[in-house]
């Protein structure tokens, strides 16, 4: 990731491991100790969020927590196993240059939702209409935490994207740069 985006970016990994799982805890520790651009976050101890213990929240929604962090100004949401392409880097650079609050990428015919859970970004240091983007995100989280889908079963498919569509997209749509190879004219 840093080869394409640069050393200033930090990868944040949210995890839920028992302290008794020494092998995996050791692997996480080794990963963090050998990579100074990785921030490990135990979802049972999340300071600065409306939920200190996020174990009941659908795991794919954990990756949205940086939107509540006052130390985060720019945030990209990707799956851990995603490969970053030069095309994506160019799209992100275009979005960052725009000053817009949200970035959404859809690059496959099956990407038929406004915001893919693992292909979007947020600028928290900008305005989103008449409010700051941070304020918009706090409001979104207030409604996200009241939505039963936020607490979906771990094996569920798509609750993260539905949450973004319901609670973020209504305000983000007009504040977004969208890169869409297939569906833009039809859906959004």
Task: Locate each region found by the language model.
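Catalytic phosphate/metal-binding cores of nucleic-acid and nucleotide-processing enzymes, i.e., regions
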Residues: 12-15, 37-39, 95-99
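Catalytic core and acceptor-binding pocket of nucleotide-sugar-dependent glycosyltransferases
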Residues: 108-115, 122-188
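Structural recognition of the beta-strand scaffold that forms the well-ordered cores
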Residues: 12-13, 102-105, 119-121
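Conserved donor-nucleotide/metal-binding helix-loop-beta segment in metal-dependent transferases, i.e.
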Residues: 83-116
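Active-site-proximal specificity loops/subdomain of glycosyltransferases
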Residues: 16-74, 83
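Short, acidic, metal-binding catalytic loop of nucleotide-sugar glycosyltransferases
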Residues: 1-8
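Conserved glycosyltransferase catalytic-site signature
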Residues: 60-64, 89, 157-162
């Amino acid at each position: 990731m840093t080869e394409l985006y640069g050393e200033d970016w930090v990868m944040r990994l949210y995890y839920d491991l028992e302290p008794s799982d020494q092998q995996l805890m050791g692997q996480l520790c080794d990963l963090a100790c050998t990579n100074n651009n990785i921030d490990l976050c135990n979802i049972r101890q999340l300071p600065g969020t409306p939920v200190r213990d996020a174990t009941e929240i659908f795991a794919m929604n954990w990756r949205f927590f940086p939107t509540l962090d006052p130390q985060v100004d720019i945030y990209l949401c990707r799956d851990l196993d995603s490969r970053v392409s030069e095309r994506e880097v160019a799209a992100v650079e275009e979005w960052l240059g725009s000053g817009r609050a949200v970035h959404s990428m859809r690059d496959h015919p099956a990407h038929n939702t406004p915001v893919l859970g693992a292909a979007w970004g947020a600028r928290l240091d900008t305005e989103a209409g008449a409010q700051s983007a941070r304020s918009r995100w706090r409001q979104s989280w207030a409604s996200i935490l009241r939505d039963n889908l936020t607490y979906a079963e771990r094996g569920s498919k798509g609750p993260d994207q539905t949450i973004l569509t319901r609670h973020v997209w209504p305000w983000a749509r007009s504040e977004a740069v969208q890169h869409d190879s297939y569906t833009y004219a039809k859906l959004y």
